[in-house]
Amino acid sequence: MKTKIFPLNKIAFACSLLLANPLAWAGDQFDASLWGDGSVLGVDFARFNVKNAVLPGRYEAQIYVKFEEKGVSDIIFADNPATGRTELCFTPKLQEMLDLMDEAIVKSPNSEDDTCVFASDAIPKGTFEYQSGEMKLKLELPQALTIRRPRGYIAPSRWQTGTNAAFANYDINYYRSGNPEVKSESLYVGLRSGVNFGNWALRHSGSFSRFENQSSSGFTDKGKNHYERGDTYLQRDFALLRGNVTVGDFFSTARIGENFGMRGLRIASDDRMLAPSQRGFAPVVRGVANTNAKVSIKQNGYTIYQITVPAGPFVINDLYASGYSGDLTVEIQESDGKVRSFIVPFSNLAPLMRVGHLRYQLAGGRYRIDSRTFDERVLQGVLQYGLTNHLTLNSSLLYTRHYRAGLFGFGLNTPIGAFSADATWSHAEFPLKHVSKNGYSLHGSYSINFNESGTNITLAAYRYSSRDFYTLSDTIGLNRTFRQFSGAYLPEIYRPKNQFQVSLSQSLGNWGNLYLSGQTYNYWEKRGTNTQYQVAYSNSFHILNYSVNLSQSIDKETGKRDNSIYLSLSLPLGDNHSADSSYSRSGNDINQRLGVNGSFGERHQWSYGINASRNNQGYRSYDGNLSHNNSIGSYRASYSRDSLKNRSISLGASGAVVAHKHGITLSQPVGESFAIIHAKDAAGAKVESGANVSLDYFGNAVMPYTSPYEINYIGINPSDAEANVEFEATERQIIPRANSISLVDFRTGKNTMVLFNLTLPNGEPVPMASTAQDSEGAFVGDVVQGGVLFANKLTQPKGELIVKWGERESEQCRFQYQVDLDNAQIQSHDIQCKTAK
């Protein structure tokens, strides 16, 4: 192989050819005679005489069925000998994404066979349109042949398990304070770690702490190093269960009934595995259209859904759960222009579920509290079911050797608001006292929005518990104490008797916002009633924001009454800086504070705060803080001092360490599921959707949060990478499972410009307009005049390239190459391309 450096001006013509649009529109004819006769003999230019012509090869495209996006996938085009055109191959992956009825597919592809099944043969009633400029593939098909799925539905077969990896989240805080008399320091390290292998995820949480106090007299109190375990469990999801299985130490997660720590086994549903339009509560809308009609659904004056339905009964069951309450207005516009409407009551503030939907949890094991596991074996079952548009049933059972409890309740959706009620019965046994207690607890709540007036009563709840009602934690705690003191000691516990709370918010338009809340409660073992009230008002005057908060608490047992007032002002200073001031009074204590805070930096990665305060006793204090966020974590520091000679300093850091197949990467704290991003040689490139996340020296970064069972788009901004690094694509799509660690590989090249001067064994140049692919079928470049292959998409420094100007073996050749991808200069190689014998 002969190698030389090629001057830039000699490839200008070749570049212009490659940058030109190779597609021809219907009616345009490609005149092959313009290209002479020698180097282009044997090339079929007819492929360019059709609309949206495309060269054979593998492409990445956004897939649509009608107007519904199905996701991103690789698609393959190949020459169809029957039509003489380049056509789309119907692959198993494409079949899975389209989610069509069996009757729509005449010929299915074989996953074990690489033979191209052309889409025109597989789906004769469908029309495919590939828009190369926008990288979109659209399928038009009769509606009767498409499967009606809820909006946002993703087939479980497309959920991605992720990669094997390990991580450790850390949160470190060091605090030191002192005055001339006493000095103290403490260290806290919070930990949440995990290992993923296959479909299973191992998780652990815990914390380490230590402290030390020292007096001026020389006395030192050194606390013991202490590690407190949280939970440690193994978990995986199962599509068949529409939920997950957890084994180990965990906390129950029931939405109704009692929650507690347990060592054992849990099977629970996960609503995130439903399509987004099936999560939360939204009513099913049923109606009848007399003709082909347009159905519009409005809430609070806004259209939230619109669809065209044929004549006859229709059902709409894929409304997205709304964060707002408000009845739904359904309008049916017939083809003759007549409009009918009706109302469907809707409130999302009660524990409601969609019709036919089930939420469950079944857990069994040993009771845990404060990192300790007890012999008390516990069995818990929770079930919620959407019976109708208006009624949801709730139930829960709890069983141990010395405790039983059962709950039954309902949520009710009505035109005058949302109601919920439940009753819990309990049976508690205290063996050492030779006594058992049977009790009950009643609970009810009501909520409503008045959208016209802007009034929102978010919660009006009441609970009454009988004298002999005990919770599981009450029962186990008392029995532990009885055993410890041989039944001779009766600990003092406070068990609720009556509880009532209400909150109301009112929008006053230009006059601001008003918030009112109140609660009252008492205990069986304690005289008197505790009552708390709060009134808050907020508004703005030009750019000045202000708020007022009044509160009162009353303890009738002691006769103590606390009144407090809090005033705050905030003034923007421009460019993410602001000044704020506050005044508070509680009893005879008065405090005033003045501060400045803000953020700065290209991506506002730095933030600060400076404050000064004083009270009516002459006490003064000053403090400042500074924090920084970047790809590998967040760091913070603060300092304070006061007029009593107290001083303190605090240092903190939080982040994560992730170990994976490409190495070890430092990261911001990661969530339940996250993504590892790898792009070789692209250090410095920014992750589009990640706050202050960039690729490190090794081309790795971590996207700290992803949404499970949903399409997540991971984008890269290559502007800060080296200029000669080229991305095959700057956006990838993932659909992670819960607790998964996704590995997102971006294929890159050094954008090395390589010219291969190709000749055939007979000495003739390779035909112009031939295409070159690597051993994996990826497009590498086109052959221009004189048999010159302009290859700027090489990803490997050596390998084999295949050049095609037709589908027959006699119309293709291949050659071995070796280049320097780190060389920014244009390289040229004289190579003989070998044909099949």
Curated annotation (Swiss-Prot):
UniProt keyword list: Cell outer membrane, Disulfide bond, Fimbrium biogenesis, Membrane, Signal, Transmembrane, Transmembrane beta strand, Transport
Entry keyword Transport: yes
Disulfide bridge positions per record: 813-833
Main subcellular location of this protein, as a coarse class: membrane
Domain of life: Bacteria
GO cellular component assignments: cell outer membrane
Localization, UniProt: Cell outer membrane
Membrane topology: Multi-pass membrane protein
Keyword Ligase: no
GO BP annotations, alphabetical order: pilus assembly
GO MF assignments: fimbrial usher porin activity
Signal peptide: 1-26
Gene3D superfamilies, per the entry: 2.60.40.2070, 2.60.40.3110, 3.10.20.410, Outer membrane usher protein FimD, plug domain
Pfam families tied to this protein: PapC_C, PapC_N, Usher
Family recorded in the similarity comment: Belongs to the fimbrial export usher family.
Record PANTHER family: OUTER MEMBRANE USHER PROTEIN (PTHR30451), SLR0019 PROTEIN (PTHR30451:SF5)
Described function: Essential for piliation.
Protein name, entry field: Outer membrane usher protein HifC
Organism: Haemophilus influenzae
Lineage, highest ranks first: Bacteria, Pseudomonadati, Pseudomonadota, Gammaproteobacteria, Pasteurellales
Gene transcribed to yield this protein: hifC
